[in-house]
Design a protein with these regions (language model features):
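Structural marker of alpha-solenoid helical repeat scaffolds
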Residues: 1, 35, 68-69, 102, ...
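Terminal, low-structured helical/coil segments at or just beyond the last alpha-helical repeat
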Residues: 137, 149-185
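Position-specific recognition of the canonical hydrophobic site in helix A of tetratricopeptide repeat
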Residues: 10, 17, 44-47, 51, ...
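Structural signature of tandem alpha-helical TPR/SEL1-like repeats
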Residues: 19-31, 53-65, 86-98, 119-132, ...
Length: 185
C-alpha cells in the first residue's frame, strides 16, 4: 500500500472519530496503521477511541505502541492520564515527567505532575519541572504553583523570591498576596 493510502485512511479515521462513529474510525485507523507502521497517529486515534469507549487497557496499549513508534509528548501524556485513571500514580508521574522532557510547557503534564507530587509525597521531585516551565510566555500560574510547592517543602526563602517577582509584575495578584502573607506570619 502507498503513503497516499495511509493518509486517506488516517484522515477518514479522524473524520469518523470527530463525528463519534467509533466503529468506522477504528476500521480506518487500523487500515492506516497497516499501511505505515512507522507513523504513530493511527495508534493515537485508536487510543482516543478506546478512551471514549472506557476501555483503558486498550487505550494504554495503543498509547504505548504510539510511543514506541514515535516517542513524544502526546503518547506520554495519554499514558499518564490512563495510569491516573487506573490508580497507577507512580507510573503516571514517570510518564508526565517524560512528557516534560519533550515540552517543558505542557500545562496538562505540569499540573498533573504537581497533583501527583502531592499524592506521592514527591513535591521535591516536581520542583525542577516547574522551574523548567518558567520559560517565555505567561508564567504567572506556574510561578505561583512553584512558590506554593517551595513553601510546602520548607524552602520559604525561595518561595518568597518567586512571590516577590509575581507581585512585582502583578501587584493585584490576590493569590500571591495571600501566600506572601502566610510566609510573613
Amino acid at each position: 500500500m502507498s503513503h497516499l493510502d495511509y493518509e486517506i485512511n488516517k484522515e477518514l479515521g479522524e473524520c469518523y472519530l470527530f463525528m463519534g462513529e467509533y466503529g468506522k474510525a477504528r476500521d480506518y485507523y487500523t487500515k492506516a496503521a497497516e499501511c505505515d507502521t512507522s507513523c504513530s497517529d493511527p495508534y493515537l486515534g485508536l487510543a482516543a477511541i478506546a478512551v471514549h469507549e472506557g476501555n483503558y487497557k486498550d487505550a494504554l496499549t495503543f498509547y504505548t505502541k504510539a510511543n514506541q513508534v514515535s516517542p513524544g509528548e502526546k503518547p506520554l501524556t495519554g499514558m499518564g492520564m490512563i495510569e491516573i485513571e487506573q490508580g497507577n500514580y507512580a507510573k503516571a508521574f514517570e510518564h508526565f515527567a517524560a512528557t516534560l522532557s519533550f515540552n517543558p510547557g505542557n500545562m496538562l503534564a505540569v499540573n498533573s505532575l504537581v497533583q501527583l507530587g502531592y499524592v506521592l509525597n514527591r513535591l521535591t521531585d516536581v520542583l525542577p519541572y516547574l522551574e523548567a516551565a518558567l520559560g517565555p510566555g505567561d508564567t504567572e500560574a506556574v510561578r505561583y504553583t512553584l512558590a506554593a510547592c517551595l513553601m510546602s517543602t520548607g524552602r520559604k526563602d525561595a518561595a518568597r523570591r518567586h512571590l516577590e517577582i509575581l507581585l512585582g509584575e502583578n501587584p493585584a495578584n490576590t493569590g500571591a498576596k495571600e501566600l506572601y502573607a502566610q510566609l510573613a506570619a
